């Protein structure tokens, strides 16, 4: 299912001409039901003060990430701290998990962050590690090397049709592409497909097969979740065999590090361009939005975009070389920021409007039907206006979005338990993306002073994106606690991770009281109670 181009009305801004060759993109829209209303509203940009000229040196040749005697580090490793943004109400009013697995310890027990997160976090780990290179799966006993089916999360038997999948989903997809695909969902085309319910709805099972990336001729070259530039030839093949070398104690990690260092800024930008996720489409109903229908549309859209965001992250060169825990933490920390950056980019050519999807276009006044969302809309529109004033270019946007992901983990709770080697790799990768942004700005034809000012202006906006994300998360949690909209699947896991992290930060090492913990548990078991 290949969709060649996105709508022309949403093409990237073209105020500058970089003169770079752009690789063709293929996007596959996904259709989910929602509501649609459109009107117009002009929202002025928020006032930003201009910074002093930064003393930011631009290396003439960025081909090695190792620090040299004359090399100035260009990565802003501490752009912001992770604030505690959750209200106490959100911590004690959770909906029940979609997975019937018991909690093995209280949420706020003062132990490592890894053991305080919900059990359902394992699903996110499976999605993140689904395309890693590792040893073949020999059975449930080899859990350290096991892969999981991207469709139903059962143990995968191998890499079939472009993704890791079990024998059941492999055989089902094979039958479907051979002609037996006239399935009809008896419900709303939103059935949950997991190990226990994968046979309940063939239509939704086939839809999920396509969503996770199953194709008729799955390519083994994409086994690691990303592709380096083709000119690297044999070096790329070494990446795809990393699992075997790891078990034999080989030096593949060093080879990978060198390969990342060898990527020029231009090559890295082209790789980010290839990694861009497809647009998610929403059908247009004929009735105006209500609070429930708008929140349902936005949460469904976010849940679909999260799946593509994980695939996008794994295509960033070097991301899958981080520890699995660090990958999960990064995604949990910044998922809403990444989605908001994409929303701002889609909206940059449409003043006063928010382009959530090509056919879901909202203006500020339409948010009046949802309590508390106007403030979030205002922040999104204001930051988008600032990007518009700066005439943000597509390649700059690609680098900024990658920086939001990679720079989202600098807080004391995380760094205290972070693997040292993985932390070094993360800093290495952030340096590479920052150098790529510097290269993109330098290619725009600005003077040296203008380049420094532009870089400073772009980096200052990252804190405003974080602020909008915090406010959006607070609003989403309040809607969930009030039972305005049900939240399922991956979106529920991400929200639960934020609740746990907020609770962990608020107690600063002390345990939550038993009364509070029981109250939270009671709220999860009785989502319909006031």
UniProtKB/Swiss-Prot annotation:
Residues 149-214 bind DNA. Nuclear hormone receptor. Binds estrogens with an affinity similar to that of ESR1/ER-alpha, and activates expression of reporter genes containing estrogen response elements (ERE) in an estrogen-dependent manner. The modification Phosphoserine is found at residues 61, 87, 105. The keyword Lipid metabolism does not apply. A zinc finger (NR C4-type) spans 149-169, 185-209. Phosphorylation at Ser-87 and Ser-105 recruits NCOA1. It is found in: Nucleus. Residues 264-498 form the NR LBD domain. Keywords: Activator, DNA-binding, Glycoprotein, Lipid-binding, Metal-binding, Nucleus, Phosphoprotein, Receptor, Steroid-binding, Transcription, Transcription regulation, Zinc, Zinc-finger. Pfam families: ERbeta_N, Hormone_recep, zf-C4. GO terms for biological process: cellular response to estradiol stimulus; estrogen receptor signaling pathway; positive regulation of DNA-templated transcription. GO terms for molecular function: nuclear estrogen receptor activity; sequence-specific DNA binding; steroid binding; zinc ion binding. Its main location: nucleus. Residues 507-530 are annotated as: Disordered. GO terms for cellular component: nucleoplasm; nucleus. Residues 1-148 are annotated as: Modulating. It comes from Callithrix jacchus (White-tufted-ear marmoset). Composed of three domains: a modulating N-terminal domain, a DNA-binding domain and a C-terminal ligand-binding domain. This is Estrogen receptor beta. Binds DNA as a homodimer. Can form a heterodimer with ESR1. Interacts with NCOA1, NCOA3, NCOA5 and NCOA6 coactivators, leading to a strong increase of transcription of target genes. Interacts with UBE1C and AKAP13. Interacts with DNTTIP2. Interacts with CCDC62 in the presence of estradiol/E2; this interaction seems to enhance the transcription of target genes. Interacts with DNAAF4. Interacts with PRMT2. Interacts with CCAR2 (via N-terminus) in a ligand-independent manner. Interacts with RBM39, in the presence of estradiol (E2). Interacts with STUB1/CHIP. PROSITE patterns: NR_LBD (PS51843), NUCLEAR_REC_DBD_1 (PS00031), NUCLEAR_REC_DBD_2 (PS51030). PANTHER family: KNIRPS-RELATED PROTEIN-RELATED. Glycans are attached at residue 61. Residues 521-530 have a biased composition (Polar residues). The keyword Transcription applies. The gene is ESR2. Belongs to the nuclear hormone receptor family. NR3 subfamily.
């Amino acid at each position: 299912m290949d969709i060649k181009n996105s709508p022309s009305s949403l093409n990237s801004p073209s105020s500058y001409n970089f003169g770079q060759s752009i690789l063709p993109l293929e996007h596959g829209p996904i259709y989910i039901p929602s509501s649609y209303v459109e009107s117009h509203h002009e929202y002025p940009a928020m006032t930003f003060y201009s910074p002093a000229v930064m003393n930011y040196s631009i290396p003439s040749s960025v081909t090695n990430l190792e620090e040299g005697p004359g090399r100035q580090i260009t990565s802003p490793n501490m752009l912001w701290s992770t604030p505690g943004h959750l209200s106490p109400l959100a911590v004690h009013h959770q909906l029940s998990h979609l997975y019937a697995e018991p909690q093995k310890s209280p949420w706020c027990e003062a132990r490592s962050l890894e053991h305080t997160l919900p059990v359902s976090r394992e699903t996110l780990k499976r999605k993140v590690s689904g395309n890693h290179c590792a040893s073949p799966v020999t059975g449930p006993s080899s859990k350290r090397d096991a892969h999981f089916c991207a469709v139903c999360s059962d143990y995968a038997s191998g890499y079939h049709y472009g993704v890791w999948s079990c024998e059941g989903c492999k055989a089902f997809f094979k039958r479907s592409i051979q002609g037996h695909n006239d399935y009809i969902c008896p419900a709303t085309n939103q059935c949950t497909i997991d190990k226990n319910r994968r046979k309940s709805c063939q239509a939704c099972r086939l839809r999920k097969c396509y969503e996770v990336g199953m194709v008729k001729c799955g390519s083994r070259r994409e086994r690691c979740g990303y592709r380096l530039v083709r000119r690297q030839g044999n070096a790329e093949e070494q990446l795809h065999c990393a699992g075997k070398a790891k078990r034999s104690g080989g030096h593949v990690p060093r080879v990978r590090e060198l390969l990342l260092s060898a990527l020029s800024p231009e090559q890295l930008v082209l790789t980010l361009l290839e990694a861009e996720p497809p647009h998610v489409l929403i059908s247009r109903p004929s009735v105006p939005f209500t609070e429930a229908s708008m929140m349902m549309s936005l949460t469904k859209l976010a849940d679909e975009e999260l799946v593509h965001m994980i695939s996008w992250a794994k295509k960033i060169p070097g991301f899958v070389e981080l520890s699995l825990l660090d990958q999960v933490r990064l995604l949990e920390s910044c998922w809403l920021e990444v989605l908001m950056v994409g929303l701002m980019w889609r909206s940059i050519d449409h003043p006063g409007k928010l382009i959530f999807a090509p056919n879901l276009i909202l203006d500020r006044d339409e948010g009046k039907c949802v309590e508390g969302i106007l403030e979030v809309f205002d922040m999104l529109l204001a930051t988008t206006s600032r990007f518009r004033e700066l005439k943000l270019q597509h390649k700059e946007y690609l680098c900024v979005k990658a920086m939001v992901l990679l720079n989202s983990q600098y807080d004391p709770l995380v760094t205290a338990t972070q693997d040292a080697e993985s932390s070094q790799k993360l800093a290495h990768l952030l340096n590479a993306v920052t150098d790529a942004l510097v290269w993109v700005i330098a290619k725009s034809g600005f003077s040296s002073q203008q380049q420094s000012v532009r870089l400073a202006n772009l980096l200052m906006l990252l804190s405003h994106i974080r602020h909008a994300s915090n406010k959006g998360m607070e609003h989403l949690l309040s809607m969930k606690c009030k039972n305005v909209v049900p939240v399922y699947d991956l979106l529920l896991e991400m929200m639960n991770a934020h609740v746990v992290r907020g609770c962990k930060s608020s107690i600063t090492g002390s345990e939550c009281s038993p009364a509070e913990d029981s109250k939270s548990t009671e709220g999860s078991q009785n989502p319909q109670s006031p």
